[in-house]
Amino acid sequence: VPYIDDPCGPAAQQRIKALRSGEGILLGNLRYLTEEISTFENAVKLEPKDMKDTYLVRSLLPLCDFYVNDAFAAAHRNAPSMVAFQQLLPTAAGLLMQKEVEALDNIMEHPESPCVFVLGGAKISDAFGMMKQVLQSGRADLILTGGITGEIMLLASGYRLGSVKENFICDRGLDVFVKDAEEYLKQYPYKIKFPVDLAYEQNGERKSVPVKDLPKEEMFMDIGDETICLYEEEIANAKTIFVNGPAGVYENPVFEEGTKRIWKAIAASEGYSVIGGGDTVSAAQRYIDLSDIGYVCTAGGAMVRYLSGNELPLIKAMRSAKE
């Protein structure tokens, strides 16, 4: 299939017009179009009906018979390529889109119990968005927290992480999540588990210490050994598992133990597992064969928003086209 570095300009239009039956062409990256970026990233509040007059749509519409979207990973982007063509052309979802939505709907609508969410990493806004949805809906039987998410839970429970770690959290504005964490722990005390020990580096080696005895001047970069064992047991008993984010700074060999052993526990589990997000998939590939995972979602931001109960612009546009 030939490629042309033009998404919708004169060169692209000429090549499309020259296509013969059975031929195809790959057009340039839409993300280089100002319209595609500004409508989503610069908060230009355009409705899909307003996007029908954008250059992209006006250029390609006369050359199209159908609109097929297979990009669930971009489903959270309110851009002309994602939401405008559905109003003007016969529309269909691609096979990958169908698989992605079905896998996530399986988690959201029909999870087999016990359903365990493993939430870690540094993007704690993602974790807290999902946490609220799956706790309020009753879909999560248990949430295992690691990374910064787990440390926020510790702060919300009254533990001190020492000046180094607490300054790290505050300097990045992540302490704003402590209030939400306190509320979740109050409402769902038996559904959220946080680390009972953390790990730091001492003389080049990993050292685990109980959360009640954390030193003040250390930087904690992984869940501790006892926490790992507790989480492994919960994962082994789970029937449905969703994972987003690593347990620690696995890129550093000193702090890879938590992430590595959790992934191996998930791979060995008989439960149905779903993972997604770039960092999550990268971490999984380092330690396990992805064929041991029930479903690997290609999406990051779109997946998080979908599981957080937010209506995605693409999904809304596709449903409107059906109606």
Residue spans for each PLM region:
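Active-site loop-to-helix "anion-binding N-cap" substructures in soluble metabolic enzymes
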Residues: 1-323
